[in-house]
Amino acid sequence: MKDPYDVVKRHYVTEKAKMLEGLSLGDGEGKKKGSFCKDPKYTFIVAGDATKPMIAEAIEAIYSAKGVKVKKVNTMCVKPQPTRIFRGRRKGRTAGFKKAIVTFVDGHSIG
């Protein structure tokens, strides 16, 4: 197995990712009718060649002190997006990356 920190690069923090975490924690933030999830979900940026079993093992190894158990891993590749730099004269691209949404067993969380 690779080093867990080579597989999982960092925690992915966006408004959507925070809303997904908030739905499972049961607080009032981001709660709509019928939008409550039972199991906590967290989003991470992972290595491009990482598989779902590798991601699950790495998350459990990194958060072993908290005793988390991974229930399910969903992955997706985010494509590079075109950007414009300096008043639209020079064009570039953002970097693409692989994102993993990790579902923990009910009652486990990293927060």
UniProtKB/Swiss-Prot annotation:
Recorded superkingdom? Bacteria
For this UniProt entry, the molecular function terms from Gene Ontology, in alphabetical order, are:
rRNA binding; structural constituent of ribosome
* Keywords for this protein: Ribonucleoprotein, Ribosomal protein, RNA-binding, rRNA-binding
Q: Which GO terms describe its biological process?
A: translation
Please report a single Pfam family linked to this protein.
Ribosomal_L23
Q: Which GO terms describe its cellular component?
A: ribonucleoprotein complex; ribosome
Q: Which InterPro entries match?
A: Nucleotide-bd_a/b_plait_sf, Ribosomal_uL23-like, Ribosomal_uL23/eL15/eS24_sf
- Tell me its family: Belongs to the universal ribosomal protein uL23 family.
Q: What's the stated role of this polypeptide? A: One of the early assembly proteins it binds 23S rRNA. One of the proteins that surrounds the polypeptide exit tunnel on the outside of the ribosome. Forms the main docking site for trigger factor binding to the ribosome.
Q: How is the subunit organization of this protein annotated in UniProt?
A: Part of the 50S ribosomal subunit. Contacts protein L29, and trigger factor when it is bound to the ribosome.
Q: What is this protein called?
A: Large ribosomal subunit protein uL23
Q: Which organism is it from?
A: Chlamydia trachomatis serovar L2 (strain ATCC VR-902B / DSM 19102 / 434/Bu)
Classification of source organism: Bacteria, Pseudomonadati, Chlamydiota, Chlamydiia, Chlamydiales
Q: Which gene encodes it?
A: rplW
